[in-house]
From Swiss-Prot:
The keyword Translocase does not apply. Keywords: ATP-binding, Cell membrane, Endoplasmic reticulum, Membrane, Nucleotide-binding, Signal, Transmembrane, Transmembrane helix. Disruption phenotype: Insensitivity to root growth regulation by root CLE peptides (e.g. CLE8, CLE9/CLE10, CLE11, CLE13, CLE14, CLE16, CLE17, CLE18, CLE20, CLE21, CLE25, CLE26, CLE40, CLE41/CLE44 and CLE45). Lower carpels production. Impaired interaction with CLV2. Reduced levels of BAM3, especially at later stages of protophloem development. Ectopic fruit organ initiation after floral meristem termination. Enhanced resistance to nematode infection. Enhanced disease resistance response to the bacterial pathogen Ralstonia solanacearum. This is Inactive leucine-rich repeat receptor-like protein kinase CORYNE. It is found in: Cell membrane; Endoplasmic reticulum membrane. It comes from Arabidopsis thaliana. It is a single-pass type I membrane protein. GO terms for biological process: maintenance of root meristem identity; phloem development; regulation of cell differentiation; regulation of flower development; regulation of meristem growth.
Length: 401
């Protein structure tokens, strides 16, 4: 990487040297032409005493034209110089597109990554942005790899638009690698090959929340209310960190159960933070977890993340898959939020709760209060939704964590 940066530095210095040489030649010609004009004007002025009135007028016009020409030449030269200097500064500030592994963890080496990627890896799942794999390094470390979809939607690999997306993605990955929170997936390394990126994360043995909830529906896994509430609190604490604790506010843009990973203790970790805004395949992707303002007017704020969280909290409370119709009643509107609101207004909120976790009266009261929080998060108006900071306080009040 150091050698690559040296080559980039050498090419930048060569470019600057050529431009400086151009400036010297250009301005030497400009100064020569200006001095010639001055000599012409001087010669004309010495002969003007013996000139006729007509010749005097011609001489005056020549002098004016020479002065105007000199001023215009100076202005054009200044503009060209300013443009070139700005271009040089912009070029030097550009992030170089790195190739090969970029590692952020001392437990991983570029060599071990290359070797593991070349061998067989186990497919775990996929979404619009790419596929997830399980991979074992030569030191025995188990990691998860997400191979992002190709950047084919932004032109050829060497086009300026493709390079721009790669630079933005690279900057985003470097930003994500610096985030440290127990409820965020830590980026350990990434590899760029041609127009594809492979992201390396810690391996989560319980998979995604989507995987677990599917197993709950088929009765392969039991997930009590205490664990579900812990998952909800962990998700919103991750959002709180992104929204309020980072130097620059970070939005998730694609919060849904497939992007919530669960460790061995069912502690949630948010994955793919911010990547959806960069990947071309996600620009038009809208799911039932997307806030109405993001799908209707392409506006996205921290309150849009809160809407997505409200959908996840609704899934945890009801156990239902929001992509399936909830009931035949027209009053429900066919969406999770409208269905929950309808039951709340009709005094039948208990009917929405997952029957497999109903039992103790105290837990049932907590679930009903959480249902009210869900409905607020799913408001059509962003200003009516609570912030992630407020949600942490609201949810932790339901139970002692």
């Amino acid at each position: 990487m150091k050698q690559r940066r040296r080559r980039n530095g050498c090419s930048s210095s060569n470019t600057i040297s050529l431009l400086l040489l151009f400036f010297l030649v250009f301005f030497s010609r400009t100064s020569t032409s200006t001095s010639c004009r001055r000599r012409t004007v001087k010669h004309l002025s010495t002969t003007s005493t013996s000139s006729t009135p007509l010749e005097s007028r011609i001489t005056s016009k020549v002098i004016v034209i020479s002065i105007v020409s000199g001023i215009l030449t100076g202005l054009v030269s200044a503009l060209v110089l300013a443009f070139l200097v700005r271009s040089i500064v912009k070029f030097m500030k550009q992030t170089p597109i790195l190739k090969g592994p970029v590692v952020f963890s001392p437990k991983i080496t570029p060599k071990s990554l290359h070797a593991a990627l070349s061998n067989g890896i186990q497919l775990l799942g996929s979404d619009l942005n790419g596929k997830y794999y399980k991979m074992v390094l030569d030191n025995g470390l188990v990691v998860a790899v997400k191979r992002l979809g190709s950047l084919e939607g932004v032109g050829s690999p060497e086009s300026s638009s493709s390079k721009s997306v790669k630079r933005r993605l690279q900057k985003e990955l470097e930003l994500l690698a610096g985030l440290r929170h127990r409820n965020l997936m830590s980026l350990r390394a990434y590899v760029r090959e041609s127009d594809e990126f492979s992201l390396v994360y810690d391996y989560m043995p319980n998979g995604s929340l989507e995987d677990v909830m599917n197993k709950v529906r088929t009765k392969e896994v039991e997930l009590g209310w205490e664990i579900r509430l812990r998952v909800a609190v962990g998700i919103v604490k991750g959002l709180q960190y992104l929204h309020f604790s980072c130097e620059t506010q970070i939005l998730h843009y694609n919060l849904k159960p497939t992007n919530v990973m669960l460790d061995s203790e069912f502690e949630p970790r948010l994955a793919d933070c911010g990547l959806a805004k960069i990947m071309p395949s996600s620009h038009t992707a809208v799911s039932c977890y997307s806030a109405p303002e993001s799908s209707q007017s392409n506006r996205y704020t921290d309150k849009s993340d809160i809407f997505s969280f409200g959908m996840i909290l609704g899934v945890l409370l009801t156990g239902r898959d929001p992509t399936h119709p909830f009931c035949e009643e027209s009053a429900s509107g066919g969406s999770l939020g409208q269905w929950l609101k309808h039951l709340q207004q009709s005094g039948e909120a208990r009917e929405a709760l997952d029957k497999t976790i109903l039992g103790e009266e105290v837990e049932e009261d907590e679930m009903l209060m959480a249902l009210r929080i869900t409905i607020i998060c799913l408001s059509d108006f962003p200003a009516d939704r609570p912030s992630s900071d407020e949600l942490v306080h609201m949810l932790t009040q339901l139970h002692s964590f």
